[in-house]
């Protein structure tokens, strides 16, 4: 399960739940917030286990001044258009400081080959095309500026919504610098809340409505509702508020005002 306050994987989660058969873990920097990757990475190394960082939502997020995606054996990034750094379509990348892993990843992404017509293993066609690469190269120069704007918007939400008793915000871990791919809150009676904001011209999202252990794809594991209470609470109550680099400050305050009005009425 995730931590009930940060909504991320924690060292306590890992040390309490990991089995003797485990060989590694995948940790997700969810919503653009960094999980406790430094301590978890140290624990995994001491126990000779690998760690993959899912950095799909954390382009530029930091912990103790160090970028997420640089602690594990491998990090994965998504460049889907909706991400903080997005291409024109589906795209992604893998980073690692292990030469052997890098070679293997290059093979797998190019049909199992390192040179033309010589296939050493079975692979896929996951090559990033030139147009996507050019778009990402241009956008990369703007990423930090965009992340700064996201943080400004998030601060307005933090300062305003933290005073509303019916709204729960995730706790940012100490010495971390999120990039707020999503600004998530928890509220009860989510559908009523979402519909009210929609009527007031405010679009929202849900990330994510079904926890992994209740997905049909993982039913073979035998989990049931109640097994991961923190994850379930987040999935059943989370609402994502509007946040993007070019969002006007007046619009952010408008969203906050409508949220305050909603809870005054209810």
Residue ranges: model-predicted function:
Residues 5-87, 93-95, 240:
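Active-site phosphate-binding strand-loop segment of PLP-dependent enzymes
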Residues 1, 11-12, 16, 24-28, ...:
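PLP-dependent aminotransferase class I/II
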């Amino acid at each position: 399960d995730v931590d009930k306050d940060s909504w991320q994987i924690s060292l306590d989660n890992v040390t309490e739940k990991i089995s003797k058969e485990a060989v590694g873990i995948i940790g997700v920097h969810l919503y653009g917030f960094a999980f406790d990757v430094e301590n978890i990475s140290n624990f995994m190394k001491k126990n000779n286990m690998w760690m993959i960082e899912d950095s799909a939502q954390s382009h530029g997020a930091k912990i103790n001044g160090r970028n997420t995606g640089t602690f594990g054996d491998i990090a994965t990034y998504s460049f889907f258009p909706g991400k903080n750094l997005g291409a024109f379509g589906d795209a992604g990348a893998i980073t690692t400081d292990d030469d052997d892993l890098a070679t293997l990843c290059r093979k797998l992404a190019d049909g199992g080959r390192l040179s033309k017509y010589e296939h050493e293993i079975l692979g896929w066609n996951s090559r990033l095309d030139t147009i996507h690469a050019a778009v990402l190269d241009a956008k990369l120069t703007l990423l930090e500026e965009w992340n700064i704007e996201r943080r400004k918007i998030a601060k307005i939400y933090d300062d305003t919504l933290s005073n509303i008793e019916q709204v729960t915000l995730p706790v940012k871990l100490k010495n971390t610098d999120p990039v707020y791919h999503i600004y998530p809150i928890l509220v009860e009676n989510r559908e009523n809340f979402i519909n009210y904001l929609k009527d007031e011209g405010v679009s929202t999202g849900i990330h994510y409505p079904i926890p992994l252990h209740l997905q049909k794809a993982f039913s073979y594991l035998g989990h049931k509702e109640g097994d991961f209470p923190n994850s379930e609470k987040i999935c059943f109550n989370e609402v994502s508020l509007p946040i993007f680099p070019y969002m006007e400050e007046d619009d952010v305050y408008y969203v906050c005002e409508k949220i305050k009005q909603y809870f005054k009425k209810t």
